[in-house]
Amino acid sequence: MLRRNVLQLIGGGVVVAAGSVGGFIALNGPSEAAREPWKKAGQYGDFRRRALSYALLAPNPHNRQPWLVRLEGEEALTLYCDLARRLPATDPFDRQITIGCGAFLELLAKAAAQDGYQTIIKAFPEGETMETLDRRPVAHVVFKKGGTAPDPLFAQVLARRSNKEVYEPRDVPAQALTAIAQAGRAFAVSASTIGNTDLAARLRDLTWRAHLKEVTTPVTNQESVDLMRIGAAEVAANPDSIELEGPFFEAGRLVGAVNRKALADPSSAMFREGLAIYQNMAMSARSFGWLINDNRSRADQINAGRAYACLNLKATALGLGIHPWSQSLQEYAQMAGLFREAHDLIGAGRRIQMLFRIGYGPKIGPTPRRGLEAHLV
């Protein structure tokens, strides 16, 4: 109802004082400036900068892009976490942030291999705590010429997406699901995928209930709302986090329907519209996948991120969408019951690091990125 009303406002001239609806839509698309790093990837003279320009396109929680890099000498670098970009409400132990660092490192390694460099990665070289990340390095990377070959999956880096759309009502072939799982079985990570089975139906229900839990828990929902960038101007100013762009959001912003107060209020029309959108996404999932390891160290979380990057690229190569839906794996108190349910269902006595849906989604554009210079210290 809200979406229809906003579109009526556009067509009725409330938003568009002059010109056509088509003109309004054409002028209110996603921010191109916020996507510029995707076009600049690989356009650097130094091989490390070249590799980093691809690494910063990695999937990461809430698109926080928490990577800080210090270049060292001619053939090394150190990766740190930008602690201001943590997610203390939904990711209190920084597990998901660390997984995002692992995905960054895997794209770094694949990009360096294109230039003939092997990457020797040591996770947490100065020690770690499993409570929260701190100012100590996440990883130290040394590049060594030779001893590696280009990875065919690298060709998918610029096309890789997290496809957060409704998927088509058709099953994913078993052969494709097997190939995706095989791509994720790396770095001592177990990867599983399933088609449209009874277990998939249970996971649809579980992931939807976990989403509801997150958005109806005030502190976790507010964390997301505070990180929303509403409209192209906000996205261009802060090309990170959760972007709400396009004609619907621009029109809703102009008429006062889309704002942070409404997005944080479970009784608002905007909140209900958001629930409907996400429920449609959840119920469209016919296939799922998940990653498991022992989670005994931060290195296990890094490895989960590296494995996820591999299978995300494989899914892209197969023309499939993939969308992390891991709310039930989060460690805050209100999610404890669903956390146990998820692990009882598919955990096999170990730690589920990632849970995601797989399917045929529409073609979508890239998400905002901050650019290489924002990550260098």
Placement of each model-derived feature along the sequence:
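Acidic, surface-exposed loops and disordered segments
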Residues: M1-V377
